[in-house]
């Protein structure tokens, strides 16, 4: 596992070479105004670097995220746009129900691939 950024406020990156999949976990419990500026650049750079290395599936594991604001939602939208523009796919997993409700209210759920667990995402990747 690779850590990008400060351990307490960064991203943990796990690569699954056989599936061409990158799992990105957020180390902080908050995706809000205070952390998203630094995370946005780290996340974009990580996605672009891994795409250049041949990876095509990206999983954002939100298991640790307990707080999210509009900046955090924007971070997820940026990740979705970066992967889509580079012919790759973004998946989200371990999302708290209140975050899904926020996505529903903002009407972005239909544009996101949301799964319950990493295992569910990996099964979907294998079937794609």
Protein language model regions, located:
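Amphipathic alpha-helical interaction surfaces in cytosolic regulatory modules
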Residues: 31-112
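STAS-typified acidic loop motif
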Residues: 9-44
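Short acidic-hydrophobic, aromatic-tinged amphipathic segments that line or gate anion-handling sites
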Residues: 113-117
